[in-house]
């Protein structure tokens, strides 16, 4: 291939890849699947390897570069990145608006722009001749850290912007964009799954995870964690306003190819602002990322300059903060809980504190290393955080330089607090474990896990019933559940004949649970719901899985060396093989169907939104997947159907805007019945 022909093909591939990156990472509307995208990237990599002289810094293959030689350089901002003043109530918000009107003049026409306040890491991106030249953290507001090598790996950050787009957006070739780097909940959950599998403490929240990721010295790690960048401000290279209005700036940034938060609203009155804030707080739990409030800005740049700044914040903008999902309280005690796999988890018992509208009295401390990292003692004051349904976590010790008088060091036990057996710590892992397989705490947690929703789903078998069954010696392993009689259940406290009959019905129904749920219920270390599903689809039967070697297991998605070792250790233990046989005798399903390739639902992507009248979200997801379909968490052009129930949110709106078919539960059930016919 000639040099000219190679150059032409390389540029064509780059344009195609940039186009599809924009559709996927910015618009959430992919046109091709991952395999097709990967093939485009491989072709480009192959051509660039054959013609290294044609490699340019803005090529999609150059997102991941070398490590910074020595940390990150300090660089002054073109214009200070100031924090915003906060308000925490409607009254305070109205007071701010009144001050703005007084300073602007009562006759001034003022328009406000309301935007979701993303809870992430502020970032300034500098472009020279349309090319990404530098990425700076906020730092202290005056001086930030140069994290350009890491910013380049964020797929929603354009590495270059074509002249045509610059002209369309009326933006000079040299400019600055400010925005927020966030870690979506899906990426955060994946990160913590990986950390748990490695024996590490999970990250406390998406914001901390994003901040830690962007400051790592390993760009390849940043590339693996899907960070997003949302642009919200545009400046000239001299740090001056690039546009006359904030709304105009946001539209221009979207034109340039940046991801801009679509949840924004122009308001001409404080009443409209308050309405937007209230809607945002209700909408908060339905987003795929964390927000902690709403930013309200005066729209006009001229009026912004007239209002000016206080010593530390602009007068023309304010952050309305939602109810805190963090709080400060005192650690009254530290107790150790024993999980189903024998893991010992220290838990902080706290003086009651309101966090995000919930009274919190306990928070996990994960393991001994985390207590040491925090420098925590009993009696210390700590900051705790919770986001959505995440278990409260201790984030830091407040004023740890001086512990309050009377604080006590916590010493991790050398014996299991539940059974007194020896505890061990495997080299390379952070957790201590009880090795006694007959430990009552392990058995209790194993039973609760086995019966829980999402596993065998035995409704009515909660902690109170499990404790009584154990206390009376009626169950000693999970297989004993299937030997329980009505007479035994009726003898339990608060268990009449009707309740006993209902519970036995639930137990009997659980015998029909699919193979992946049975695998998940066994409690094999590191085998969660997704891994259990992958194993069931790969092997199709319990017997085939039990005979698989470590090497064979590691060919399965989601199974690495640590997981394969845990699976083999579990099935090589005679006690566990006996348990499996007793469950087989109890009538549980030990075979499963591999995903149907010719199914009517095969290859179809569904998105669930709102509350369905008859099916839970998990039940609907399971039925679709068992019929060969796929359930996604976000709507795109590739979505085939959105299944909408009551109180459907933004996913329904997006489906309507994209023309994606919307069906209700009845239509879904009809599709499933047609599939079974």
From Swiss-Prot:
Q: Which InterPro entries match?
A: BRCT_dom, BRCT_dom_sf, DisA/LigA_HHH, DNA_ligase, DNA_ligase_AS, DNA_ligase_CS, DNAligase_adenylation, DNAligase_N
Biological process according to GO: DNA repair; DNA replication
Q: Which UniProt keywords apply?
A: DNA damage, DNA repair, DNA replication, Ligase, Magnesium, Manganese, Metal-binding, NAD, Zinc
- Name the Pfam families for this protein: BRCT, DNA_ligase_aden, DNA_ligase_OB, DNA_ligase_ZBD, HHH_2, HHH_5, Nlig-Ia
The protein's annotated catalytic reaction(s) are: NAD(+) + (deoxyribonucleotide)n-3'-hydroxyl + 5'-phospho-(deoxyribonucleotide)m = (deoxyribonucleotide)n+m + AMP + beta-nicotinamide D-nucleotide
Task: Name any GO cellular component annotation.
Answer: cytosol
**Binding locations of NAD(+):** 34-38, 83-84, 115, 138, 180, 297, 321
Under Enzyme Commission nomenclature, its number is 6.5.1.2
Gene3D superfamilies tied to this protein: 5' to 3' exonuclease, C-terminal subdomain, 6.20.10.30, BRCT domain, DNA ligase/mRNA capping enzyme, Helix hairpin bin, Nucleic acid-binding proteins
Identify the residues that the record assigns to the BRCT domain, covering every copy. Answer: 596-677
Residues the entry annotates as binding Zn(2+): 416, 419, 434, 439
Q: Which family does it belong to?
A: Belongs to the NAD-dependent DNA ligase family. LigA subfamily.
Q: What NCBIfam families does this protein map onto?
A: dnlj, PRK07956.1
Q: Which PANTHER family match?
A: CHROMOSOME TRANSMISSION FIDELITY FACTOR 18, DNA LIGASE
Query: Which HAMAP family does the UniProt entry name for this protein?
Result: DNA_ligase_A
Instruction: Tell me the protein's name.
Output: DNA ligase
Species of origin reads Acidobacterium capsulatum (strain ATCC 51196 / DSM 11244 / BCRC 80197 / JCM 7670 / NBRC 15755 / NCIMB 13165 / 161)
